[in-house]
From Swiss-Prot:
This is Chaperone protein DnaK. It comes from Megasphaera elsdenii. The gene is dnaK. InterPro entries: ATPase_NBD, Heat_shock_70_CS, HSP70_peptide-bd_sf, Hsp_70_fam. One of its GO terms (molecular function) is ATP binding. Belongs to the heat shock protein 70 family. The modification Phosphothreonine is found at residue 174.
């Protein structure tokens, strides 16, 4: 039986892993790295580049390079490259194809099945888009697993022991926090919260804005209008952010960043960790509210949380770690690799599905409530958020006026009170309702989530 791979399809980087001899193994790509940048580029001749090769040519070819496409999954968004339009699913499929090929060259056999992870807070449309990307890449996606849950699987299988775990996952573009209870091989998610548009990219952008502002003060030149300079600034901002996790000050030096009538201009700035913290303080604070909400929804007290697992590259930021510590009063566990544990968890779940991993049961939850629009534009919830899945719930509705021949069923997902403030999943019309006074016909609506 061919292997099922586990894929962490990330905003910034992606990772692929597989179960070998009962142990999860992270697969090294053809460039010799365990991380593959989630970047796609097209050369001037139209050749497609994915991963490190695409990232390397981004500065000289910014208009034909796409990064952070994950932030647009589930949206009606297209990228125009060399006169051709691509959907987020198609770009993501190119990244998945590269991971699939790397896995095949490592394993020496064809790979056709995968488990792919997504942010816990992804809605149904974003999850479906991820499945579609897998299909385009030639992969049968056996299961979509929430990233924090996958990280907890990796931690639990490696470290063992029972307890209540908080997984804090701050990646390149998304943020999730999940509370799980581990016991006797059962991984039960109690609550989840997050923000699908908060991550390392936003920290980079704050640094970039500061660099552009400082350079403008010094030279009067606005670099935000220069595509090529902007790509160099983005790379320098990311590098500075990473360095400031281990040092208190870093130098940002970009020679020949631009030129004017007086000649070439160089950017040379010093960014301290204190200044970085000041620039990004609102982003750090934005992770705290969902964390508090997830703890409250889990039914546990802060003192009952036994372990904190940090996932995602941005969780290495010292100010982020300090903020978590200030809420929970304990040091986060350093026992997992924040870049690799999600893919490892996906590989473990793949192992569970094909029977390679025994005595592990994963009980996840739905992150957003599922329901329909009722009279007055109200969102009536049928399945509440944080309900353990798989699940099935039914509710009986009726007509609003006498002799109503049909009902428009508007299916939504979200957490707001009014239908207009939530995400539409679909609409359908139920016709052929027998003539009767309002309130008499009984219409049963059933939702299944698997």
């Amino acid at each position: 039986m061919s292997k099922v791979i586990g894929i962490d399809l990330g905003t910034t980087n992606s990772v692929v892993a597989v179960m070998e001899g009962g142990e999860p193994t992270v697969i090294t790509n053809t460039e010799g790295s365990r991380l593959t940048p989630s970047v796609v580029g097209f050369s001037k001749t139209g050749e497609r580049l994915v991963g490190q090769l695409a990232k390397r040519q981004a500065v000289s070819n910014p208009e034909n390079t796409i990064s952070s496409i994950k932030r647009h999954m589930g949206e009606s968004y297209t990228v125009d490259i060399q006169g051709k339009k691509y959907t987020p699913q198609e770009i993501s499929a190119m990244i998945l194809q590269k991971l699939k090929e790397d896995a095949e060259s490592y394993l020496g056999e064809k790979v056709t099945q995968a488990v792919i992870t997504v942010p816990a807070y992804f809605n149904d449309g974003q999850r479906q888009a991820t499945k579609d990307a897998g299909k385009i890449a030639g992969l049968d996606v056996l299961r979509i697993v929430n990233e924090p849950t996958a990280a907890a699987l990796a931690y639990g299988l490696d470290k063992g022991g029972d307890g209540k775990i908080l997984v804090f996952d701050l990646g390149g573009g998304t943020f999730d926090v999940s509370i799980l209870e581990l016991g006797d091989g059962v991984f039960e998610v109690k609550a989840t919260n997050g923000n699908t548009h908060l991550g390392g990219d936003d920290f980079d952008n704050k640094v970039m804005e500061w660099m552009i502002s400082e350079f403008k003060k010094e030279t009067g030149i606005d670099l935000s209008q220069d595509k090529m300079a902007e790509q160099r600034l983005k790379e320098a901002a990311e590098k500075a952010k990473i360095e400031l996790s281990t040092v208190l000050s870093t130098n940002i030096n970009l020679p020949f960043i631009t030129a004017d009538a007086t000649g070439p201009k160089h950017l040379d700035l010093t960014l301290t960790r204190a200044k970085f913290n000041e620039l990004t303080e609102d982003l750090v604070q934005a992770t705290m509210e969902p964390t508090k909400k997830a703890i409250a929804d889990s039914g546990f007290t802060i003192d009952e949380i036994d372990k904190i697992i940090l996932v995602g590259g941005s969780s290495r930021i010292p100010a982020v770690q300090e903020a978590i510590k200030s809420i929970l009063g304990k040091e986060p566990s350093k026992g997992v690799n924040p870049d690799e544990c999600v893919a490892i968890g996906a590989a473990i779940q793949a192992g569970v599905l094909v029977g390679d991993v025994k005595d592990v049961l994963l009980l996840d939850v739905t992150p957003l409530s599922l329901g329909i629009e009722t009279l007055g534009g109200v969102f009536t919830k049928i399945i509440d958020r944080n309900t353990t899945i798989p699940t099935s719930r039914s509710q009986v509705f009726s007509t609003a006026v006498d002799n109503q021949p049909s009902v428009d069923v508007h299916v939504l997902q979200g957490r707001r009170e009014m239908a207009a403030d939530n995400k539409t999943l679909g609409r359908f019309e139920l016709t052929g309702i027998p003539a009767a006074p309002r309130g008499v016909p009984r219409i049963e609506v059933t939702f299944n989530i698997d």
